[in-house]
From Swiss-Prot:
MF (Gene Ontology): L-seryl-tRNA(Sec) selenium transferase activity
Domain of life: Bacteria
SUPFAM superfamilies associated with the record: PLP-dependent transferases
PANTHER family registered for this protein in UniProt: L-SERYL-TRNA(SEC) SELENIUM TRANSFERASE
Name assigned to this protein: L-seryl-tRNA(Sec) selenium transferase
Keyword terms, alphabetized: Cytoplasm, Protein biosynthesis, Pyridoxal phosphate, Selenium, Transferase
Length: 463
């Protein structure tokens, strides 16, 4: 160690002296003695590293309290930070998918604040079943005999297979062996459930005879998987759920379906692309149908299974059900969301997912033009601001080839340097409420479809 290094080390303050500084007293009141002391030890270690590597004091040496305050504030921020989603993807998996309705938010708050009748029967003063209230709602909406709730649709598929076909073959079309995010693959789930995959047909064409010929003494299920995150077009043939259900009845083999996104309303009435609905499959005779709670349904993350009472009973009694069951906050939010479907006339207004998906291109464009005029003075020296047509996507593997006409505010650097776009996007990500857009074709695009809180957006953009 050089004499210069020793001299610099000697200038570092003692923790005890810092703790008695008035600025640190206020930090101790706010964050606690233990947390502040731990931070000061780390700061001293950092300072020694700087001295050892650069032979200089750290640039924050003159104001330890301010540096400590910044570090404590950053550490206190939640890992789940609110952001402004202007990516153009409404159900953005990385940004938490569906926004919750106000009714769902209030229901969750109530469930957290007080004991609730999660598994308590007020009439009989004994133990109840946590899925009962939601099962009643789901049966009313879908026409099913019974229902089961777990924590996501992947869990729903796993439980469905494990409880009804473990040790048996499950017949699926090759064109429906989907993979979703996180490498969730139907063949892998079957293996985990103890089932044997029996593929039939080809990637683009599967016929009714393929299912019939595949059935043997070890067949447990016939399965349909909705290819919600990709599309096969051209020379294609699939067996519809109603026809497969008829085959199942003829051969006395249950038919189950994984719908993935799972919309509970006919989206075409809102000018959106059609998506198969659970109630249609139930009416067609499918024994069990699984779908997600946090995609097109617009609720919390959950896996929902509706279908025949006897088969739902198998699911409820399986050991996996307890491991996969939903908690009281999920159930509270899902119940409140499902109740909105009982008033379909107000659904597009009250359900955020549907409200955002049904925004007109004209209203989005008007909003973008109005906000662009207010932001021109802030960004106009470096960037050309324009309002351009764009296409939003639904996201989360829902309706993968369909796009929604929208409008975006675009930022193009006057000097044409792409690095300026990267720097601008990075700067927006450091805002107290980060603004998330996308860089494409030499521009930074802010798709306005999902912007509802204009005042917060403008506050962030003008910082």
């Amino acid at each position: 160690m050089t004499s210069e290094t020793r001299t610099l080390y000697s200038q570092l303050p003692a923790i005890d002296r810092l703790l008695h500084d008035s600025a640190f007293l206020s930090l101790r009141d706010r964050y606690g003695h233990t947390q502040v002391v731990d931070l000061l030890r780390r700061m001293l270690d950092d300072a020694r590293d700087v001295i050892r590597n650069t032979q200089t004091l750290p640039d924050w040496y003159a104001d330890w309290a301010q540096e400590a305050k910044l570090r404590l504030e950053n550490a206190a921020q939640s890992a789940l930070r609110p952001v402004i989603n202007l990516t153009g993807t409404v159900l953005h998996t990385n940004l938490g998918r569906a926004l919750q309705a106000q009714e769902a938010i209030e229901a969750v708050t109530q469930a957290m604040r007080a004991p609730v009748t999660l598994e308590y029967d007020l009439d009989g003063a004994g133990r109840g079943h946590r899925d009962r209230a939601l099962a009643t709602l789901l049966c009313r909406i879908t026409g099913a005999e019974d229902a089961c709730i777990v924590n996501n649709n992947a869990a729903a598929v796993l439980l469905m297979l494990a409880a009804t076909a473990s040790g048996k073959e499950v017949v699926v079309s090759r064109g429906e062996l989907v993979e979703i995010g996180g490498a969730f693959r139907i063949p892998d789930v079957m293996r985990q459930a103890g089932c044997t995959l029996h593929e039939v047909g080809t990637t683009n064409r599967t016929h009714a005879k393929d299912y019939r010929q595949a059935v043997n003494e070890n067949t447990g299920l016939l399965m349909k998987v909705h290819t919600s995150n990709y599309s096969i077009e051209g020379f294609t043939k699939t067996v519809e759920e109603a026809e497969l259900a008829e085959i199942g009845r003829e051969l006395d083999i249950p038919v189950v379906a994984d719908l993935g996104s799972g919309s509970l309303v006919d989206l075409s009435q809102y000018g959106l692309p059609k998506e198969p609905m659970p109630q249609q499959l139930i009416a067609a005779g499918v024994s069990l149908v699984s779908f997600s709670g946090d995609k097109l349904l617009g609720g919390p993350q959950a896996g929902i299974i509706v279908g025949k009472k006897a088969m739902i009973a198998q699911l409820q009694s399986h050991p996996l059900k307890r491991a996969l069951r939903a908690d009281k906050m999920t159930l509270a939010a899902l119940e409140a969301t499902l109740r909105l479907y009982l008033h379909p006339e107000a659904l597009a207004e009250k359900l955020p997912t549907l409200r955002l998906l049904t925004r007109s291109e004209a209203s989005i464009r008007e909003q973008a033009q109005r906000l662009q005029a207010r932001l021109a003075a802030r960004y106009g020296d470096e960037f050309a601001l324009e309002v351009k047509p764009c296409l939003s996507q639904i996201g989360s593997g829902s309706l993968p080839v369909d796009r929604l006409p929208s409008a975006a505010m675009t930022f193009t650097p006057h000097d044409g340097r792409g690095s300026r776009l990267e720097a601008l996007a990075a700067r927006w990500r450091t805002l107290p409420v980060p603004v998330i857009g996308r860089i494409y074709d030499g521009r930074l695009w802010l798709d306005m479809r999902c912007l509802e809180d204009e005042s917060r957006f403008m506050e962030m953009m003008l910082k």
